[in-house]
Amino acid sequence: MLKCIPLWRCNRHVESVDKRHCSLQAVPEEIYRYSRSLEELLLDANQLRELPKPFFRLLNLRKLGLSDNEIQRLPPEVANFMQLVELDVSRNDIPEIPESIKFCKALEIADFSGNPLSRLPDGFTQLRSLAHLALNDVSLQALPGDVGNLANLVTLELRENLLKSLPASLSFLVKLEQLDLGGNDLEVLPDTLGALPNLRELWLDRNQLSALPPELGNLRRLVCLDVSENRLEELPAELGGLVLLTDLLLSQNLLRRLPDGIGQLKQLSILKVDQNRLCEVTEAIGDCENLSELILTENLLMALPRSLGKLTKLTNLNVDRNHLEALPPEIGGCVALSVLSLRDNRLAVLPPELAHTTELHVLDVAGNRLQSLPFALTHLNLKALWLAENQAQPMLRFQTEDDARTGEKVLTCYLLPQQPPPSLEDAGQQGSLSETWSDAPPSRVSVIQFLEAPIGDEDAEEAAAEKRGLQRRATPHPSELKVMKRSIEGRRSEACPCQPDSGSPLPAEEEKRLSAESGLSEDSRPSASTVSEAEPEGPSAEAQGGSQQEATTAGGEEDAEEDYQEPTVHFAEDALLPGDDREIEEGQPEAPWTLPGGRQRLIRKDTPHYKKHFKISKLPQPEAVVALLQGMQPDGEGPVAPGGWHNGPHAPWAPRAQKEEEEEEEGSPQEEEEEEEEENRAEEEEASTEEEDKEGAVVSAPSVKGVSFDQANNLLIEPARIEEEELTLTILRQTGGLGISIAGGKGSTPYKGDDEGIFISRVSEEGPAARAGVRVGDKLLEVNGVALQGAEHHEAVEALRGAGTAVQMRVWRERMVEPENAVTITPLRPEDDYSPRERRGGGLRLPLLPPESPGPLRQRHVACLARSERGLGFSIAGGKGSTPYRAGDAGIFVSRIAEGGAAHRAGTLQVGDRVLSINGVDVTEARHDHAVSLLTAASPTIALLLEREAGGPLPPSPLPHSSPPTAAVATTSITTATPGVPGLPSLAPSLLAAALEGPYPVEEIRLPRAGGPLGLSIVGGSDHSSHPFGVQEPGVFISKVLPRGLAARSGLRVGDRILAVNGQDVRDATHQEAVSALLRPCLELSLLVRRDPAPPGLRELCIQKAPGERLGISIRGGARGHAGNPRDPTDEGIFISKVSPTGAAGRDGRLRVGLRLLEVNQQSLLGLTHGEAVQLLRSVGDTLTVLVCDGFEASTDAALEVSPGVIANPFAAGIGHRNSLESISSIDRELSPEGPGKEKELPGQTLHWGPEATEAAGRGLQPLKLDYRALAAVPSAGSVQRVPSGAAGGKMAESPCSPSGQQPPSPPSPDELPANVKQAYRAFAAVPTSHPPEDAPAQPPTPGPAASPEQLSFRERQKYFELEVRVPQAEGPPKRVSLVGADDLRKMQEEEARKLQQKRAQMLREAAEAGAEARLALDGETLGEEEQEDEQPPWASPSPTSRQSPASPPPLGGGAPVRTAKAERRHQERLRVQSPEPPAPERALSPAELRALEAEKRALWRAARMKSLEQDALRAQMVLSRSQEGRGTRGPLERLAEAPSPAPTPSPTPVEDLGPQTSTSPGRLPLSGKKFDYRAFAALPSSRPVYDIQSPDFAEELRSLEPSPSPGPQEEDGEVALVLLGRPSPGAVGPEDVALCSSRRPVRPGRRGLGPVPS
């Protein structure tokens, strides 16, 4: 956006003006100045009332925004905007659109929403370019009948109008994608609506539709359909035709069922059918495999379909306010479910399979009839569990109990069983409640009525339905409550409870009383109970019924007293009826006893007020403390029975033996507990009574205050006391600071309690403060004489910063002092002899065994947790001043571990662990809030010392705060994995079994973490390959161990499999999880490792490089690239793909092709990409220490490769080949590709040339500078078509210098090269060549041991510049890329043949005259020799004894050389005729090798023909130049001939005096200091067409080119030709050569050699 500011001499060329939200009341005048250039004008959100005349002179406007103004009229001059594309006049007061709008022919986007329009002008439909039209909320009553003329409409918005019908022409809008008709009065849709082929969104909400046309199913591209808030009673079956539908909104209709065709909507993601009348959901819903959100709220569903379990992508299921009675067990199949809402249904039980929905975070079951929750829900990571509407917190604390009906373990809490709110069906029961209260004492009104007239018995239910149960009861007086309570207790002893669903109907009076008492529905199941054998049998059901009637019809005050109870929280709906023969204490939590006649409900009392009853500070005698700590309840009903569970501040309940319970009942003075004024007397009586009941339980109770009782061990322990000491510490500051953090200060958040002092909140482990003895929690009193008591935080910071180098600080430290008195051991009762917290799992399965002795063995563990953004991820319970976690134990315990939190990920904590110290602060006898403050301190890491009951001996782990471990000595606890050894660490059962049953020994290694590195690296994980370790059994392995690191000193080795880290199972962990487990801060790292055998062939080799010597290897593979192992595509290792015999590796002889590289100079190669491995290998010095192991066998695995390799052409390779080109690299920075027969190389593998310049390896050759900037301009030839293979591969040649003596695979033959090599040829034709010395004897070509790239001709180097050879296509001719049409080619051939005949005689005459001079320019080899050498590759005959390669057989009987596919076929036919039995090949070649041979052979054919063309061109040009200039003049060609430039020869001739290492390659001469610059070469002008570089057959047909009529271009051609071919040897050409040359075809003047074509 451009804000135009009218400055002086401002630029008048303004295209956009934005004046939105500027409170303009008129169009600014400066806008008119830009009428010639203004294209975009935005005046939205102003106060414009009219548009003046000059406004419509802005003829170039393309976008006009006038929304949110007060414009009352749109003038007809709007037709002036003939270039207007976008018009927005929404939210104005425009009453009509002018007819002249039709002249805005360019209008594409128009928005008229929010105007008081009632109709559209007749010419509006002439806006044929209109694509987006918005007419929302314009009071439109009908659409124009010809609206179909707007054929380009893509979006049509007609929301909030008065439309009652749609025109039939709407179906002509074939481009329409979005149609919004919501908020209209449509009653029926036209059938033609289904003829919109491109419609994607259809909005029909808030209309009056009663049915949808079946033609709607033809909208195959429809994505969103909204028909909510209509009157639909059914959906058409054709709805299943909407195959792309993702959103289907059917809310607020009258649907009773969904069609079965809905299962065809495979893409459906959101289905909303809330507020309908659904009685069932079709089973076909399970076929909607992509459904993620299903809303079925407020329907009449009784059950859900079983196919719901197929919806594996379902995340949100809402079935609130239905009539569900049960959930199908298949709901556990919804593994992605995260929110399940079942509020206000009739559910009595939840299926345990619900625990399979592992992603479930929110479960809402409020308003149901649940008795309990399945215990399996503890496996879920629930964030919210709603059991009631008025629930205060999203998560509750649960107890476990056994279901009396099924015997299964269930969860319960104070909100279970549920008490659903009264509904219409309960109104009849609640209506007559006033009858029960009508006989209240006359002095008080029991029920406050809201109706004037009294209600009779006959219409009580009807009146109650009208009132909806709205009554208010009078609050009883406390004195009345006491009388009522006694009456209720007396009546309970007269009758046994009756189960409502036992078969006998309850009397009406009893139903009313039950509803008044509990408000629970009649079909809820009772909670779990425990059977008491000694309980007397109750009466039968009939007797129960009679007693109930008697009890409920008793009149007067007794009824009123009975109906009122002290506020209780009910756990079941079975009310305790009068007639129970047991007296129920008020404060005693009752275990649900099962009687023969019915079930006793569990009553849970309200939590007492914190001021009532037992207070330790007000106890009159110390014996009461002993009794209290021994297990007394706050209400004093008796000790906690073993097996009871605490629920926060609430009292536990547990089944007890009948005798014990009777004893407690006899001596419990319950009546006195209600009165506050009798509190002290009640406490004394309670304590004395309990002492009498527990005779023999406590032998001697010490009369000392503050004793504690350990019920687990039955010990009376004198508590430790906290002493405070003042210390003076001196810290020597270092460059990194003091290594402490402080918290608190006056005016800041207190660090501990209400103390506003300065505290140490964090101490670095290796910092100066830690070495001086500073601890977390120390209170800072003084720093270098500056008092900090009462100081603010910033003052303390400044004091520490300005303290200088030596900091002397005075701190105040709290420490626990153990008592001197011995522990008093009390005899155990038999029923108390087991751990009361065994079943407190909370969803984590702990391998805890019941102790065999009264005092179980305890094991201490160290856990170090790093605080995450969500905290530490665990909760603690217990401590002084809090409810004990274990009865009689004031210690602090881990009570809950949040799944996915820091503690859960660490795996070192377990529920039930006792916390002994936090960050070195002893908390064994600390208060709960003190421990919380230590855990919530600002320290990022928390070190915990834990104590855990274990069955085995204690491991030798030192305490972290006693003596810090040194880094030099590693504590290692080794346990051999033999069955029956008790010394294995405490592990999960599955991990323990794996450690015991494995074939290899398992050891536990402990590494003290002193702040330094561990000295090891790992590889593998469930998401990473671990090659070469664990190929058959993946896992996490140690891939590197530093020689003198902590891991090496502890005995860890490369190849060890890590099973667990600090108790956390990492066998199936991802790589990142394993790394996080190892890096997690802790005081000691415990590793459980398995000694897996080392990879086969693991050894370390040391190779010394001579000064300037190359390493001489190439590598392949690497992470995130092409696999280097042909046997395993997932193997990301680094392998040796080539070993050059001239390098240090070849001289050493121990490295071979196929070995896997693990480390180079102590640097691991595991997990490195190909490029990183190359850089690492290139950076080594003269000494190479490499760790290798066996990889693959080059000879056997070569045939497994699908692709024969990568022929890297850095110029023609596209983005798609980047990975493959980077997967093979030479390690030597200056290494060039060498002769294919001179290296040990994997077949089909070639080197990828980097941008480095090549260097000559032979003696006498100067390095050549290769400038690829000019070559990179050569256009790519596109895809490569492979030529079908026609010949078998040759025999493998024996390398004379192979150190291992093995036969390397044969190199690629010419058949392997791609068919269109002109790009690589053109790019490489300019490489200068060298010629061997003239005195070199001619001998059959035998490849030397090594040759540098400069010693090779361009034919031999072509394969390094080819594209990747791909799989051949099926049985088709090779694709030919022709740059010249067939007609033009035929004409050129005819023309050149005619000119050739005319010039032949003249050239024969001139050839003899130019013979002497031509000898100076051409080499001395005859054309026949050239052809014979051209037809055979340099490596085709490696030795005189080896047979010729069948790729290029010699001509028979002096026939023509084989240079084309046709010639080869003819030659093979002759061979078959002469020798009917074909020779059997010595080795069957793989298809890859055959393709390589075929491609390379054809490339050599083409190169030979190209070379002969060049020589012909040179000779012909020289002859023509001589003939035209005459003898007396020296032409430019003769002058150029004197310049030193090599001439090509087709095959190599080894030179004896240069040695085998430096034999020159074919056709090259030493260049004395001559560097070839391709930039100068690419700048040479060229007009020669490129049709001479074609596919083989086409190049064979191209025979002659037209001669030159003028000498100028010939001279220029001569220059280029000599630059290309080099300087010829003097006297190298005889007259016979000239005659042979003249018999061939001349060259056209425009031809300039075969160098790269300048772009």
Curated annotation (Swiss-Prot):
Residues 1105-1117 are annotated as: Interaction with tick-borne encephalitis virus RNA-directed RNA polymerase NS5. Residues 717-1229 are annotated as: Interaction with ARHGEF7. Changing P305L: Decreased palmitoylation. Loss of localization at the plasma membrane. Loss of targeting to cell-cell junctions. Alters interaction with TJP2. Loss of pro-apoptotic function. Residues 458-474, 656-701, 1379-1419 form a coiled coil. Keywords: Cell junction, Cell membrane, Cell projection, Coiled coil, Cytoplasm, Developmental protein, Differentiation, Disease variant, Leucine-rich repeat, Lipoprotein, Membrane, Palmitate, Phosphoprotein, Repeat, Synapse, Ubl conjugation. The modification Phosphothreonine is found at T378, T475, T689, T826, T1342, T1545. Expressed in kidney, skeletal muscles, liver, lung, breast, intestine, placenta and skin mainly in epithelial cells (at protein level). Pfam families: LRR_14 (PF23598), LRR_8 (PF13855), PDZ (PF00595). Changing C22S: No effect on palmitoylation. It is found in: Cell membrane; Cell junction; Cell junction, Adherens junction; Cell projection, Lamellipodium. One of its GO terms (cellular component) is immunological synapse. Residues 728-1194 are annotated as: Required for interaction with VIM. Residues 556-565, 660-694, 1422-1432 have a biased composition (Acidic residues). The modification Phosphoserine is found at residues 37, 504, 688, 708, 764, 835, 853, 875, 939, 1140, 1220, 1223, 1226, 1232, 1276, 1279, 1295, 1298, 1306, 1309, 1348, 1378, 1437, 1445, 1448, 1475, 1486, 1508, 1541, 1547, 1561, 1591. PANTHER family: DISCS LARGE, PROTEIN SCRIBBLE HOMOLOG. It is linked to Neural tube defects: Congenital malformations of the central nervous system and adjacent structures related to defective neural tube closure during the first trimester of pregnancy. Failure of neural tube closure can occur at any level of the embryonic axis. Common NTD forms include anencephaly, myelomeningocele and spina bifida, which result from the failure of fusion in the cranial and spinal region of the neural tube. NTDs have a multifactorial etiology encompassing both genetic and environmental components. Belongs to the LAP (LRR and PDZ) protein family. This is Protein scribble homolog.
